[in-house]
Every structure is written in structure tokens, then in C-alpha cells.
């Protein structure tokens, strides 16, 4: 974290890059973002990506095991980069800042797919499956 803070200051990005750490009410912050970046090495179901989709925030995510690739439909709903390939991540962030349209289109499309994570819909589907047994 200190390394990141040092580089944020070094490159005079303190007004553009915030490292907030864990926040209990992430929704209070996420809707103000222009871009959401997930750099995880491992995830289960990264709810934070679903939250970013809810607010139509463009997403760039590591293609870590289980989660981002499925949520972003293999890159259809956001951009993916190989875990640890920070040059590709940097390229994608720069490209987003220069030409936002492609990633913004993906983020708007993502909102149409949010029903996949609706608890009521999923519980109804599970109930139907259980009743078939």
C-alpha cells in the first residue's frame, strides 16, 4: 500500500486516484467512479463487480480463477487482463482514458445482465429444481 501511495504522489495523481481500503458501504463510493479496476489474484464471486455493473461503471478486471470471466461474459461486459500483467492493465486504463466509448458501451450492456444475480430469481429457480426431485 505504501508503494502505491508513493507512486500516486510521485506521478501527481492524488486528485484522481483514491485508495480507500475496505469500506462497509461500498455503494456510497462506487457510484462516483469513472472506472472500476479489480486486480485480484483469486476470487469467489466478486460482488464488487456486480455492484459496479449496477451503476454502469466501466470495468477492467484481472481474469483470475472463478468470477470475473463469468460475470463479464468473457470480456463482453468489461475488459479482462491476465493476472499479474500490469502492462496490459496500464494499456487498458490509458486506452479507456483516451477513448471511453467501447468500455462505456460494455458497461451499459452489463446492466441488462444483472438479473443473473438477483436473489429472488435465483431462489425461485432453485425451488423449481428442488420440486422436480
In which residue ranges do the predicted regions lie?
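Nucleotide-activated donor-binding/catalytic signature segment of Leloir-type glycosyltransferases, i.e.
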Residues: 4-21
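Aromatic "clamp/platform" in nucleotide-sugar-dependent glycosyltransferases that forms part
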Residues: 22, 41
